[in-house]
A protein has these predicted regions:
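Non-catalytic interface/linker regions that flank or bridge core catalytic/transmembrane domains
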Residues: 1-279
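Alpha-helical phosphate/pyrophosphate-handling elements in metalloenzyme active cores
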Residues: 50-63, 278-314
């Protein structure tokens, strides 16, 4: 039976979006569901199902040979897949039941069963959870790259060269793209500009696979010199001084590892979980959520909720 790839892709894409919303678009919870939450096994399943439907392979190696992913992406996908299945099997053995939630009570014994040792000031369970969050982030990044690449390859819409929107960037409908794959390599200052552009243009919410992949490969470009570059610091100030979309921009920067490269102190808390019941998310997620709530108080439509907070945040001292 012939499968309508476009309909199948759309159905799976919507299914994934709805599932992510159910888990509040986050895998960085105290007790993440390693199968259903964003960055979990189901996100890998979605990729394989769509790739198989597109006749692009049944394994990551086959997909690599078809040219849709790079060798590094293939190796990472194999690694995170193996890691998640190993974690899930040990969870089932430890609980003696079908359990896909990394519940608080089993995190410490699970870490010991996996042979994970703690470090100074960190329990084995905290080390294990940070490994999980890093893998979940990697899966989320690769999921975005591959799904967008499939959409672009098999879309029946006429190919768009893109309308120049800023030096190095083009607009393709509601998608932000790059003029060439090496835009960031030639000028690493463009990395932060990608987030500034989307903050200022909420009508361009999507990124092209070329832009996704360029961000994924940009880590080696974001060194100490890059972080201390006055141009990059100025661009970052423009982002956090924006009237709208600041939290979303910071969330995206964190998702692609840019925020931690720009702010080394922030990088140390990425994926860091405290082994107690008082913290529902990782430290980096708590920090970003705090910023989100503070930003909400600056919007007049939210002033009725906590008027004192709004007054304090919007207060400007009188001129002397």
């Amino acid at each position: 039976k012939n499968l309508n790839l476009k309909k199948f892709y759309r159905a799976k894409f919507i299914e994934q979006q709805q599932r992510h919303l159910k888990y509040h678009e986050s895998s960085y919870a105290l007790e993440p569901n390693i199968k259903e939450a964003p960055g979990g096994l189901r996100d890998l399943n979605i990729l394989i199902w769509v790739l198989r439907a597109a006749h692009l392979g049944n394994t990551w190696q086959e997909v690599f040979k078809k040219g849709l992913i790079t060798r590094r992406e293939c190796e990472l996908l194999e690694s995170v897949t193996k890691s998640l299945y190993r974690l899930r099997i040990h969870m089932h053995l430890l609980t003696n039941r079908h359990e896909d939630r990394l519940i608080f009570e089993i995190q410490e014994p699970l870490a010991k069963a996996l042979g994970i040792v703690g470090t100074v000031g960190r329990r084995p369970s905290e080390v294990m959870m940070q490994h999980f969050y890093v893998n979940a982030k990697t899966i989320g990044q690769l999921n975005s790259i591959i799904l967008q690449a499939i959409k672009e390859r098999y879309s029946k819409e006429p190919e768009q060269t893109g309308e120049p929107i800023c030096s190095g960037f083009v607009r393709q409908g509601d998608v932000l793209g790059l003029e060439s794959p090496d835009v960031f390599v030639k000028n690493p200052e463009r990395i932060l500009e990608a987030f500034l552009i989307q903050e200022r243009h909420p009508d361009i919410p999507m990124k092209s696979s070329r832009l996704y992949r360029a961000l994924f490969e940009a880590h080696s470009l974001m060194n100490k010199e890059w972080a201390e570059n006055p141009v990059n610091r100025q661009t970052f100030l423009k982002i956090i001084q924006g009237r709208r979309g600041v939290w979303h921009a910071l969330e995206e920067m964190n998702r692609w590892g840019v925020l931690g490269k720009l702010l080394p102190s922030f990088n140390r808390i990425v994926g860091q979980m405290q082994h107690d019941l008082f913290h529902a998310y990782t430290v980096d997620q708590h920090t970003l959520l705090a910023i989100r709530y503070l930003r909400n108080f600056t919007h007049s439509e939210n002033a009725h909720e906590l008027p004192l907070c709004t007054d304090c945040l919007l207060y400007t001292s009188p001129s002397p």
